[in-house]
A protein has these predicted regions:
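A generic structural signal for short coil/turn motifs at secondary-structure boundaries
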Residues: 117, 136, 236-240, 276-278, ...
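Outer-membrane beta-barrel pore domains
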Residues: 27, 94-95, 138, 146-149, ...
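N-terminal periplasmic/intermembrane-space "pro-region" immediately following the signal or transit peptide
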Residues: 2-90, 368-372, 455
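Outer membrane beta-barrel
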Residues: 59-235, 243-245, 255-260, 264, ...
C-alpha cells in the first residue's frame, strides 16, 4: 500500500517461492515441502517387479478432464500485542488487528496441470477464489471488488489459462494468460506459500499482489529462463477499472538448479506507471514506478535452506525510494517439525509507502483513486526479526479423513533503527481519516499463531 497525503496508489505484494515457476503458485501440502514422497526401489524389489504378471489389456480411455484437481485451504490465526494503543499492529496488512482472532482465508482452487496435447503443445488452467479477512488486500478492481465491504470479503485471486508452446527454443515457452498472482517476492498469498503467519515489509508494501495480463517464460537453456510480461497494473483491470492508460510489465531472468540443483536465482523488474488517473489526473499516465526484485535460495542439504530476497521500489509521483533485504533460514528437525527464522532491514525514505489502512475498504478505495482512511509515519528504517515453527501434528493428521493440519506459532520484534517512534500509537491530523504515527514506541514485540487445514 502507498500512504501519502496526496492520496496516491501503487504496487504492493506478492508471491513466489524459491524461483519463478512456469505457472502460477502451485498448492503445496506440508508433506511435499522438500521431502521425498517415496523411497528408491532396492535391487530385490526391482527383481520382484520384473517377475510380476504383465497386463496386456488396453488401458481404459483417459481424457483431458480426468486430471482436474480441487483444493481447499482454510487459515485462521490470532496475535497478541498488549502494548498497542490503537488496536492494530503497525505496518501490517493481513495481520493488522491486534489481540484478535481472525479467519484469514478460505481458498478454493480448481485447476488442471499443463497436459500434453500432442506435437509439443500443452494446456492447463487455474481458477481460485478467496474468502476471509485477507481478501481486503487481494482485490482486483473490476472483478467483484466491493461486493462485500466488511472485515470478511471475497476476491477472485487466480483465473488464468496455462499453455506450453514448442516455439523459439528447444524447450519452448510457457504462457499464463489472465489473472494471476504477482511473481516477485518470496512470500505468497496462499497460507502454505510462506513460512510465517505475518509478512515481511517488502511483501506487504512493495511487490504487486495481483496482475491481469500475459506472462511468458522462455526456456533459453536447461537452467536459464527469460521472463517477459505485460499487464494492466497492480490489482487493476481495464476500462473504468484501470488505474491509467499505460501498460505495465515484467522483465527478468531465472537460473534454476545450479550447483547440482542446490541454487536457484531469480531477478525481475516490474515497470510502468501505477498511479490512478481518478486521483491525480493525467499525470498518472507518465509517473513511472520501478520495482526490482532479487531472490536466491540455496539448499544446504535435504533439511536446511537459506533464502535471500532483496527488493527496491521507486515512484516518480511519490518521490520516494523504498528498499529492503530479507534473509530466511529453514531447517527440518523432523518430517513434522520445521524451524523458520527471518531477518529484515527495510527503508522507507520519506514515509510515503509504509503505514496502515484503517477502514475495511481503504485499500480498495486507494486502488480506485478515491479518498480512504489511513495512518502514515515519517521516513523510517525498519528492522524485523521473526522466529517460529511449522508443526504438523502426526496424532491429528494420521486420523484426519481429508487433508492435513499445520500450526505455526511465531515471535516477532519490529524496531525503528533511525530513532523514529511509529509503533503502537497514532495522532490525529488536520485531514479527516488520516493519522500520523510519530509519538509511539520505537519497537513492537508481538506474538502470533495460525492454523492451516489444507486438503
Amino acid at each position: 500500500m502507498k500512504f501519502c497525503y496526496r492520496l496516491s496508489m501503487g504496487a504492493c505484494f506478492a508471491l513466489q517461492l524459491a524461483s519463478v515457476p512456469a505457472f502460477a503458485q502451485e498448492r503445496l501440502t506440508p508433506e511435499e515441502a522438500g521431502r521425498p514422497l517415496v523411497s528408491e526401489e532396492t535391487a530385490a524389489e526391482k527383481q520382484d517387479a520384473a517377475k510380476a504378471e504383465v497386463n496386456l489389456k488396453p488401458p481404459e480411455s483417459h481424457n483431458w478432464f480426468d486430471d482436474l484437481e480441487g483444493h481447499i485451504v482454510v487459515e485462521a490465526g490470532v496475535n497478541g500485542n498488549p502494548w498497542t494503543h490503537t488496536g492494530r499492529n503497525w505496518a501490517q496488512s493481513y495481520v493488522d488487528r491486534a489481540n484478535t482472532a481472525t479467519l484469514n482465508q478460505i481458498t478454493g482452487t480448481l485447476s488442471h496441470p499443463v497436459s500434453d496435447l500432442g506435437d509439443g503443445y500443452g494446456l492447463g488452467f487455474v481458477f481460485e477464489v478467496l474468502y476471509g479477512s485477507d481478501a481486503r488486500f487481494n482485490p482486483t478492481i473490476g472483478m467483484g471488488d466491493g461486493n462485500l465491504t466488511g472485515m470478511y470479503q471475497w476476491a477472485p485471486t487466480q483465473a488464468h489459462i496455462d499453455a506450453h508452446l514448442p516455439w523459439f527454443t528447444k524447450d519452448g515457452v510457457d504462457l499464463q494468460i489472465g489473472q494471476m498472482y504477482g511473481m516477485q517476492g518470496f512470500e505468497g498469498t496462499d497460507a502454505l506459500e510462506r513460512p510465517f503467519y505475518s509478512y515481511n515489509y517488502s511483501s506487504d508494501f512493495i511487490v504487486p499482489f495481483e496482475v491481469v495480463g500475459v506472462t511468458a517464460t522462455v526456456h533459453l537453456a536447461e537452467h536459464f529462463d527469460w521472463i517477459l510480461g505485460v499487464n494492466a497494473g497492480n490489482s487493476t483491470t481495464f476500462g473504468g477499472a484501470k488505474n491509467n492508460s499505460r501498460p505495465k510489465g515484467y522483465f527478468g531472468f531465472a537460473f534454476n538448479g545450479l550447483m547440482d540443483g542446490k541454487l536457484d536465482i531469480t531477478a525481475t523488474a516490474y515497470l510502468g506507471p501505477q498511479q490512478s488517473v481518478y486521483a491525480i489526473g493525467r499525470e498518472a499516465n507518465h509517473a513511472m514506478e520501478y520495482i526490482g526484485d532479487l531472490l536466491a535460495t540455496y539448499k544446504i542439504d535435504d533439511k536446511t535452506s537459506v533464502t535471500l530476497n532483496g527488493t527496491y521500489f521507486h515512484d516518480d509521483y511519490l518521490q520516494d525510494d523504498v528498499y529492503g533485504v530479507t534473509v530466511y533460514y529453514a531447517h527440518d528437525f523432523y518430517p513434522w517439525l520445521t524451524f523458520n527464522a527471518r531477518g529484515e532491514v527495510f527503508r522507507d525514505n520519506n514515509g510515503g509507502v509504509v503505514g496502515n489502512n484503517i477502514g475495511t475498504m481503504s485499500y480498495v478505495n486507494e486502488l480506485r483513486g478515491r479518498n480512504y482512511a489511513y495512518d502514515y509515519a515519517p521516513g523510517t528504517t525498519y528492522g524485523e526479526l521473526t522466529v517460529g515453527v511449522s508443526y504438523r501434528p502426526q496424532f491429528i493428521n494420521d486420523n484426519l479423513a481429508k487433508g492435513s493440519l499445520t500450526i505455526r506459532p511465531e515471535l516477532r520484534l519490529d524496531k525503528s533503527l533511525n530513532g523514529t517512534r511509529p509503533f503502537n500509537r497514532t495522532s490525529a491530523t488536520d485531514t479527516p481519516g488520516v493519522g500520523y504515527a510519530d509519538k509511539g514506541m520505537n519497537n513492537m514485540f508481538w506474538f502470533s499463531c495460525d492454523a492451516i487445514w489444507a486438503f
